[in-house]
Amino acid sequence: MKICLITDTEWVKDSLLKYLDFDYNFTHLIGSDDIKLSYDYIFVDMQVNNNGGPSIIREISRDNKFANSKKILLIDREADIFQAKRVGADGHLLKPLDKTNLKKVFT
């Protein structure tokens, strides 16, 4: 399974990696400009540098290369669920991440 995380925050990366207990290829990017390959799952932080996570989801959703990728927005608060739905994310996870909810993304 190919997993990409777009975030500029180290603790978000660490919290995702500590719960992945299966075989995977992981790519960590600090911005959406660096995304070149297709992935099974693309996790996007709510805020990355000066770019909002919802706009990154919208941007990569326009590229057919990512049509089969599951795009998951990592939200800061429950109120951000609206943003995830509005931009067409395939799912969302509330930070800090927990194992139970992360596992639901993969099932």
Region locations from a protein language model:
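Conserved phosphotransfer microenvironments
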Residues: 43-60
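A short, hydrophobic beta-strand element within the central beta-sheet of small alpha/beta folds
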Residues: 68-79
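Conserved acidic carboxylate
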Residues: 6-7, 75
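Residue-level signal for the "D+5" position in two-component response regulator receiver
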Residues: 28, 50-51, 86
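Acidic, metal-coordinating helix/loop segments flanking the phosphotransfer/catalytic sites
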Residues: 28-41
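C-terminal output helix
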Residues: 97-106
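Two-component/phosphorelay signaling modules centered on CheY-like receiver
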Residues: 7-28
